[in-house]
Amino acid sequence: MKTHKNHLRLLILLLLVLLACAGYMTVGVHFENQKLFAYAMRIRTPKLIAMLITAFSIGSASIVFQSIINNTIVTPCLLGMDQLYSLIHTAVFFVAGSGSFLAVNANAAFAVDLAIMGAVATVIYSYLFRKTNHNVLYVLLIGTVLTSFFSSIQTTLTRVMDPNEYDTLLTDLVASFSNVNSAILVLSVAVLVLVAFALRKELALLDVLTLGKDQAINLGVDYDRCIRRLLLGVTLYIATATAMVGPLAFLGLIIANLSRQFLSTYRHSQLITGSVLFGMAVLIGGQLLMERVFVYSVPVSVFITVGGGVYFLYLLLTQRKA
């Protein structure tokens, strides 16, 4: 009975997302003018696809990460990918300037971001995980230290940077769906699909892994290998989303916990689906609000940061009372 209720809730969420998509694609469009209509569709379609891809990558990665760490108020941003993204772009502007190839070419910037973050994720969260005897808490601590390290270097560079370059850099460090093109979208989808395919066996074992290490091993699961591969997959998913649109630190916290509270189940297939759908609704709704109400004066990341901060405090207070 509970499974049927959750399926119904997921269906309602899906309908809300479809309505949000339809609203985003049609609000303010001049249907009577063929050229204006075609122009609006050409501008909005890549943005919508980017929001759907971002919601999928962050939503699924957040649920998996929380299950690995066994804590529902942590987010994958603790792995340091957001700060590494900021450091990469700050270094490019500091060394080569705002007129350099990497600063003006979105495709090249995406490729470099993804390559560096993917390499860092592979070296740190695969190699060091083995070196720490497969202790996820050590890995979480390493991620927190790296976040502070990347942030300190980035802050130092911005303090000695030319003010004009810094002003241009600020717009590049804010999450935006405006500079996404078809080449970036295709490459992002390819990366996400390849990672999901490579981890299909581990993803199927998530329900067992959350029982605990001893129980999972007793059931025949290679626990350490599964956790290591899933952690690497989470990092690559977050790296892909961050390289595509920029850092969205609180989004994972919001949508993962909304999914857990809305569905009240331990089935990861349903939790991940709910998290992805909530992510789509939040991003599309926020983008629509930013474009139509605030007329591009406030980026969507501000809404997510403010809402995520308030929601985080709510989670802390409610869990403390519980």
Model-identified regions with their sequence ranges:
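Alpha-helical transmembrane segments in inner-membrane proteins
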Residues: 1-322
